[in-house]
């Protein structure tokens, strides 16, 4: 069966694909927003990651008739009162400019001592079906903000996020290492029972 992943980011699609494969869930064809007829995406106006994930998943079902998985995630920094939060992707003003977002965040934390650079990645994943079923789960990944970027893997703020108890940034981890501990990996793992049930029931889009 086909399941829509409400994203144009191939790394998010690959992440869900790895989680499904490692968990033995088969018979799923994941499609992204680039694989379906284009539709106008609703602005992410929710006050929380959960709100935004549901907004995206509901729109995906509405426009394609496919069961839809959507996530909204971001970085919550202790010293910034848990911002950027839902503004993480456009913290510098332009949506998806990872380099600018990272540079601005590092500048804002330049005078913050190491012991006060705590942060957490947060991911909310929503699954909405054509039958109207909805579920939202959350995953968190605690750590701290490095002073300089390091690593070539991942995306977003990965090069400056050091997981708690680790010495490498998230961008220095292999995809498999990251899947096992990351916020999105944890959220997707929590979503697996619902995805497995959906596949077993063999629900198909109109």
Curated annotation (Swiss-Prot):
Q: Record keywords: Metal-binding included?
A: yes
Q: Active-site positions, per UniProt?
A: 72
- Biological process per Gene Ontology, one example term: purine nucleoside triphosphate catabolic process
Which branch of life, at top level? Bacteria
**Molecular function in Gene Ontology:** dITP diphosphatase activity; ITP diphosphatase activity; metal ion binding; nucleotide binding; ribonucleoside triphosphate phosphatase activity; XTP diphosphatase activity
Q: Which cofactor does it need?
A: Mg(2+)
Catalytic class of the enzyme = hydrolase
Any idea which positions bind Mg(2+)? Answer: 72
Which keywords fit this entry according to its UniProt record? Hydrolase, Magnesium, Metal-binding, Nucleotide metabolism, Nucleotide-binding
Return the Pfam families for the record.
Ham1p_like
Signal sequence, start to end: none
Coiled-coil annotated spans = none
UniProt-annotated binding residues for substrate: 7-12, 73, 155-158, 178, 183-184
- Comment on bound cofactor: Binds 1 Mg(2+) ion per subunit.
* EC numbers for this chain: 3.6.1.66
Assembly mode = Homodimer.
Free-text function comment from the UniProt entry: Pyrophosphatase that catalyzes the hydrolysis of nucleoside triphosphates to their monophosphate derivatives, with a high preference for the non-canonical purine nucleotides XTP (xanthosine triphosphate), dITP (deoxyinosine triphosphate) and ITP. Seems to function as a house-cleaning enzyme that removes non-canonical purine nucleotides from the nucleotide pool, thus preventing their incorporation into DNA/RNA and avoiding chromosomal lesions.
Which family does this protein fall into? Belongs to the HAM1 NTPase family.
Protein name, per record: dITP/XTP pyrophosphatase
């Amino acid at each position: 069966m086909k399941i829509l992943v409400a994203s144009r980011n191939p790394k998010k699609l690959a992440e869900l694909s790895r989680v499904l494969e490692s968990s033995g869930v088969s018979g799923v064809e994941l499609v992204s927003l680039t694989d379906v007829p284009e539709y106008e995406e609703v602005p992410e106006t929710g006050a929380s990651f959960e709100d935004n994930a549901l907004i995206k998943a509901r729109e995906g079902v509405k426009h394609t008739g496919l069961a839809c998985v959507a996530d909204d995630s971001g970085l919550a920094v202790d010293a910034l009162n848990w911002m950027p939060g839902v503004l993480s992707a456009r913290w510098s003003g332009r949506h998806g400019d990872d380099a600018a977002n990272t540079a601005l965040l590092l500048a804002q934390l330049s005078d913050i001592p190491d012991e006060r650079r705590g942060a957490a990645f947060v991911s909310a994943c929503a699954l909405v079906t054509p039958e109207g079923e909805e579920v939202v789960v959350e995953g968190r990944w605690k750590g701290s903000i490095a002073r300089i970027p390091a690593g070539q893997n991942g995306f977003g703020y990965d090069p400056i996020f050091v997981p708690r108890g680790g010495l490498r940034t998230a961008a220095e981890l292999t995809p498999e290492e990251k899947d096992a501990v990351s916020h999105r990996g944890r959220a997707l793992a929590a979503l697996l029972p619902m995805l497995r049930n959906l596949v077993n029931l063999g629900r198909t889009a109109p």
